[in-house]
């Protein structure tokens, strides 16, 4: 059967046909909470990647990667006889999808292998880069993940071209499916930005779309638009910005605006941004030998016979000098396989004028007769210097110009800035150092790592823990407040980039101490009481034992849950307290939740309903649908609403860990009606069907568990009397999971 002959919609097997999403486009996608099912992983459940990595002959692997750089293959020959530029781009485009807003993207899961990233126009030809690596991946097997290998290869590529790097940490276990929790944008055409910008443009339809195709479209204002959150790319299918300029318009000043927006959302400042662009563009070349009409479909749209390759090129040989990747044809320096300062030397030495690439894309050529740029395949050919519109931004934008002129005269400063920014690019989503493995971890600890101090004292033992629980409960603080505080501390965790969590006790620092959801006045009261308990214990404990406030906050919540449930709740000490100097307060602002379903906080935005935001929060906490459900029900029973309101507290015995929330929500004798939306937005009232008496009030956070079929099915399990003990057991297990999400020092495997 030929490609395109049998669309999935018409297939009558294997999940084909009209789907639930086709009938109900707004259906809550609970399936995103099933993504991390271990059954999707072909490796055994006890596989420990961090331990496997430690068995790796790291130096031998790097030696093999270095040899690969100059082992040009006939089926995909290396530019200038060196694959360095290709592999730098592969690593950059793997890590560069990270965005600080929600911590998603990045290279930590090796997602470049899967849709949609493997088919993005910005990733044309990276299918070949990964295939070149397969023999090495096959050789070293489970000791090196694809996620680590793609990034390490970029590091080795730099080193092989004379650019000393800052270091490298392994420890990224592979995933084996596309991450469908990520919002990459709402556009339905490649290079489109008509959703992410209110005045954006439709993209390009058809097969074989490449970066340099947007100049073919009509354009709107590119100077004053605002990029929607949480995306960090100016176009669908690009990592950052359009190399031709915004929407294909070759305007370096407007391009600088887009560059700042996208790189800042990747947690890079202006200096780091400039260093990455200059450093990355010091190597290799772009490819635009002919118009994109010569290229075939992306890998996901191709025939089985191509075996994962896409963008088959009909121009000439389809490779080497005939390659079409971006549609632009630029080699930045005269030393494309060697680190140098020639990028900046050329940028400022020459004046530049617009030209069209052989593919018709906008690019810049030096106003000179100097032919000093080597040809990638013909040693007898030389070319004029050329640049991209985004390169022109490094000179023409006043802010970037100030930075880059300094580096022109001080190249060592550029090198230091580049290798630090490159290291940050590759490791920003790795989380704490307790996840890092390998012999090249730098000794210098960087602020963006969100460091916490090492444990430098003896930890509390069981007898101490019991005594501390007693002191906490006798300190005069309501148990519900202790539970809310512990939850607030731990639930800041993001499984996407492994930031946040209880370790560090940053809930006592700005900005977390001032977040509305954390009820600052109540939080200050609880922290003051716990600091008193801490001071008393640390001042009198024997054997050098101490307890951190981070541990005490979690222990306080644990003690309160135990009191409410009458069961034992796990607790493992070992957290430490971060200082203000170890905390980038501005960076932590991105962790503030839009909603918290567990504390009944927040409401719909103009783009997402409350329950969709709740699902996103649960996904970041790496919860399953049953865990989400049992935690919400338990927190309501424990009277843990952020503002102490009664909404969703469907029980006559608040403060006891019961399944009353589910029993009363699903009571068939209760009729729910929306309250007056002008006074009480997103509030619902539950009335007795016979008497008409109002019994309860609830929010969308609450009622979704009776409305959504899958969530209701789970809620019904917990509403049954024969599952009341199961409810308590499951709540305690899920509670402990959230409290320990960031305890990578305890986990059997890094995940």
From Swiss-Prot:
Molecular function, one GO term: metal ion binding
Feature type site, description Transition state stabilizer: 89
Main location: cytoplasm
Post-translational modification: Formation of the three residue Trp-Tyr-Met cross-link is important for the catalase, but not the peroxidase activity of the enzyme.
Binding site for heme b: 281
Localization per record: Cytoplasm
Pfam assignment, any one: peroxidase
Cofactor binding mode and count: Binds 1 heme b (iron(II)-protoporphyrin IX) group per monomer.
Crosslinked residue numbers (Tryptophyl-tyrosyl-methioninium (Tyr-Met) (with W-92)): 240-266
Keywords: Cytoplasm, Heme, Hydrogen peroxide, Iron, Metal-binding, Oxidoreductase, Peroxidase
Assigned EC number: 1.11.1.21
Active site: 93 (proton acceptor)
SUPFAM superfamilies, A to Z: Heme-dependent peroxidases
Positions bearing the Tryptophyl-tyrosyl-methioninium (Trp-Tyr) (with M-266) cross-link: 92-240
Any GO BP annotation: hydrogen peroxide catabolic process
Reactions catalysed: H2O2 + AH2 = A + 2 H2O; 2 H2O2 = O2 + 2 H2O
TM spans (from-to): none
Protein's UniProt keywords contain Metal-binding: yes
GO cellular component, one term: cytosol
InterPro entries membership: Catalase_peroxidase, Haem_peroxidase, Haem_peroxidase_sf, Peroxidases_AS, Peroxidases_heam-ligand_BS
Cofactor: heme b
Role played: Bifunctional enzyme with both catalase and broad-spectrum peroxidase activity.
Matching PANTHER family: CATALASE-PEROXIDASE, HYDROPEROXIDASE I, BIFUNCTIONAL CATALASE-PEROXIDASE
Family to which this protein belongs: Belongs to the peroxidase family. Peroxidase/catalase subfamily.
Subunit structure: Homodimer or homotetramer.
Protein's name according to its UniProt entry: Catalase-peroxidase
């Amino acid at each position: 059967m030929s490609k395109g002959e049998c669309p999935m919609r018409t297939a009558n097997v294997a999940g084909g046909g009209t789907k639930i999403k086709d009938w109900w486009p707004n259906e809550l996608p609970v399936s995103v909470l099933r993504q991390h099912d271990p059954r999707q992983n072909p490796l055994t459940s006890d596989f420990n990647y961090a331990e496997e990595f430690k068995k790796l002959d790291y130096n031998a692997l790097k030696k093999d990667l270095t040899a690969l750089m100059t082992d040009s293959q006939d089926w995909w020959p290396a530019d200038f006889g060196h694959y360095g530029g290709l592999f730098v781009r592969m690593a950059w485009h793997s890590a560069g999808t990270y965005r600080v807003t929600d911590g998603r993207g990045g290279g930590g899961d090796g997602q470049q292998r899967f849709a949609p990233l493997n088919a993005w126009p910005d990733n044309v030809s990276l299918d070949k880069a990964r295939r070149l690596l397969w023999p090495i991946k096959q050789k070293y097997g489970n000791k090196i993940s694809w996620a680590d290998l793609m990034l390490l290869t970029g590091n080795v590529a730099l080193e092989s071209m004379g650019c000393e790097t800052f270091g490298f940490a392994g420890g990224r276990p592979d995933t084996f499916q596309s991450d469908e929790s990520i919002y990459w944008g709402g556009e339905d055409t490649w290079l489109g930005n008509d959703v992410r910008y209110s005045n954006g443009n439709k993209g390009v339809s058809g097969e074989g779309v490449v970066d340099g195709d947007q100049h073919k479209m009509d354009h709107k204002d590119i100077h004053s638009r605002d990029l929607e959150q949480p995306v960090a790319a100016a176009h669908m299918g690009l990592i950052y910005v359009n190399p031709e300029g915004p929407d294909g318009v070759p305007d370096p000043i407007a391009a600088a605006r887009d560059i700042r927006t996208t790189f800042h959302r990747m947690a890079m400042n202006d200096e780091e941004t400039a260093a990455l662009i200059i450093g990355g563009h010091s190597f290799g070349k772009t490819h635009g030998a002919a118009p994109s009409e010569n290229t075939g479909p992306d890998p996901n749209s191709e025939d089985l016979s191509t075996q994962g390759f896409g963008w088959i090129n009909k121009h000439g040989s389809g490779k080497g000098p005939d390659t079409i990747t971006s549609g632009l044809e630029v080699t930045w320096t005269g030393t494309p396989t060697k680190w140098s300062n020639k990028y900046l030397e050329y940028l400022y030495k020459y004046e530049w004028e617009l030209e069209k690439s052989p593919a018709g894309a906008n690019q810049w050529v030096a106003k000179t007769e100097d032919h000093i740029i080597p040809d990638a395949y013909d040693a007898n050919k030389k070319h004029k210097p050329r640049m991209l519109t985004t390169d022109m931004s490094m000179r023409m934008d006043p802010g970037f110009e100030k930075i880059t002129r300094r580096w022109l005269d001080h190249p060592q400063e550029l090198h230091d800035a580049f290798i630090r920014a490159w290291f940050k690019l590759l490791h920003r989503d790795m989380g704490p150092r307790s996840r890092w493995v390998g012999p090249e971890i730098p000794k210098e600890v960087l602020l963006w790592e969100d460091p916490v101090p090492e444990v430098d004292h003896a930890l509390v033992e069981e007898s101490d823990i019991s005594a501390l629980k007693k002191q906490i409960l006798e300190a005069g603080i309501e148990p519900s407040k202790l539970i809310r505080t512990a939850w607030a501390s731990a639930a800041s965790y993001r499984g996407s980039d492994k930031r946040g969590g209880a370790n560090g006790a940053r809930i006592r620092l700005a900005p977390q101490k001032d977040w509305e959801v954390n009820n600052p006045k109540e939080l200050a009261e609880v922290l003051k009481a716990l600091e008193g308990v801490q001071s008393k214990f640390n001042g009198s404990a024997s054997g050098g034992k101490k307890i951190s406030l981070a541990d005490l906050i979690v222990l306080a919540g644990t003690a309160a849950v135990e009191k409410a449930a009458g069961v034992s709740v796990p607790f493992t000490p070992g957290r430490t307290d971060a200082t203000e100097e170890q905390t980038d307060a501005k960076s932590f602002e991105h962790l503030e939740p839009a909603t918290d379903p567990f504390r009944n906080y927040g409401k719909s935005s103009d783009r997402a309903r409350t329950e969709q935001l709740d699902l996103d929060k649960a996904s970041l906490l790496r919860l399953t649908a049953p865990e989400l459900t049992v935690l919400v029900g338990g927190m309501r029973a424990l009277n843990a609403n952020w503002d102490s309101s009664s909404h969703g507290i469907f029980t006559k015995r608040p403060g006891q860990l019961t399944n009353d929330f589910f029993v009363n929500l699903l009571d068939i004798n209760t009729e729910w009606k929306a309250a007056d939306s002008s006074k009480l937005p997103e509030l619902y009232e539950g009335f007795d069907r016979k008497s008409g008496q109002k019994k309860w009030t609830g929010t969308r956070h609450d009622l979704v568990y009776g409305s959504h079929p899958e969530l209701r099915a789970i809620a019904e399990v917990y509403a049954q009397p024969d599952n009341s003990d199961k409810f308590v057991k499951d709540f305690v297990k899920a509670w402990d999971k959230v409290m320990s999400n960031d305890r990578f020092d305890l986990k059997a495997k890094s995940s």
